[in-house]
Amino acid sequence: MTLKEEFATRNFSIYGQWLGVLSMILCFALGIANIFTFRLLLIIFSVICLVSSFVILFIEVPLLLRICPTSSTFDDAIRKVSTNYMRAAAYLVMGVVQWLSLLGGASSLIAAAVFLTLTAICYALAGVKGQAFVGSKTLGGSGVAQMIV
């Protein structure tokens, strides 16, 4: 199944997974970009954003749990985030944290907050519509993800 065919299925978990990948890239880039400032609150939220990018990486690409040496506690925590509702909750929490970064003043972390919130909405819509989680083949789903989880 090509990427175009995956998007044509109208399964919101596929949209959520790809928005999650975009969120990961944004969180990584913006976390690094905003860490070089003199505002302590912004530095704290930048570090949280940077950590979120690595958590998202393990959530969206489950093959990495097999490849990377991580603790069993971390593996168990990531494996619990397997349903659409759990993913929506995880992304919503990360999004709310980034929205809270605006308390210290406007910054580019708002882009991460927007994408994390959009990802949470996609996963929540997939859950509400009763769509089963379908992993993108491009990201290691359909067979590879099932073997690991």
UniProtKB/Swiss-Prot annotation:
One of its GO terms (cellular component) is Golgi membrane. This is Golgi apparatus membrane protein TVP18. One of its GO terms (biological process) is vesicle-mediated transport. It is found in: Golgi apparatus membrane. Glycans are attached at N11. It holds the Pfam family Cg6151-P. It comes from Pyricularia oryzae (strain 70-15 / ATCC MYA-4617 / FGSC 8958) (Rice blast fungus). SMART domains: Cg6151-P. Keywords: Glycoprotein, Golgi apparatus, Membrane, Transmembrane, Transmembrane helix. Belongs to the TVP18 family.
